[in-house]
């Protein structure tokens, strides 16, 4: 809830450099039954700057969707940044990437990713996967409130 008692929208940060995947992910979250705000950052350096600024302001995202293959700073480096910053470490991070390589999967779970999902090639299947992430993280699980995660409780 927000300070005025109203339910605040769920804030999702999508870190993705492929415009087609951004469009499909946006479409899937727009059809969500839960009010959400989807912010998009398209390179790793901007993602770290954005996350740092949000943490400084005490308004961290409720969920991060992270591609591994990004320009400037890689997805695994961003994941490590998130999980080692006490203000961000409780934010769930779902890796959503084209790689199905075992070493990528192990490397991201070693860095404490909350889930690893290989992007389907089929558009309808991709939309379905994003909707399942939406359903699970926005309606099934309880997420720490943005302020609690940033405060490091």
PLM features: residue spans?
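Short, glycine/charged-rich "phosphate-handling" switch motifs in NTP-dependent
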Residues: 114
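Active-site residues of response regulator receiver
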Residues: 66-67, 97
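A Lys-centered signature of the CheY-like receiver
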Residues: 119
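Conserved phosphotransfer cores of two-component systems
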Residues: 54-59, 83-90, 111
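Non-catalytic signal-transmission and effector/linker regions of two-component phosphorelay proteins
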Residues: 1-13, 19-39, 45-48, 52, ...
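Hydrophobic residue at a beta-alpha junction
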Residues: 42, 70-73, 82
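Negatively charged, flexible loop motifs adjacent to catalytic sites
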Residues: 71, 87, 99-103
């Amino acid at each position: 809830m927000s300070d005025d008692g109203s339910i605040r929208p769920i804030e999702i940060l999508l870190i993705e450099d492929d415009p087609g995947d951004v469009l499909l992910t946006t479409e899937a979250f727009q059809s969500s039954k839960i009010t959400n705000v989807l912010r998009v950052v398209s390179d790793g350096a901007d993602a770290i700057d954005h996350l740092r600024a949000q943490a400084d302001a005490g308004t961290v995202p409720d969920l991060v969707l992270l591609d591994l293959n990004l320009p400037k700073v890689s997805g695994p480096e961003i994941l490590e940044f998130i999980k080692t910053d006490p203000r961000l470490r409780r934010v769930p991070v779902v890796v959503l990437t084209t790689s199905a390589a075992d070493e990528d999967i192990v490397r991201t779970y070693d860095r404490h990713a909350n889930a690893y999902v290989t992007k389907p090639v089929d558009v309808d299947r991709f939309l379905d996967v994003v909707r399942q992430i939406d359903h699970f993280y926005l309606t099934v699980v309880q997420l720490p409130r943005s302020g609690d995660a940033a405060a490091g409780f």
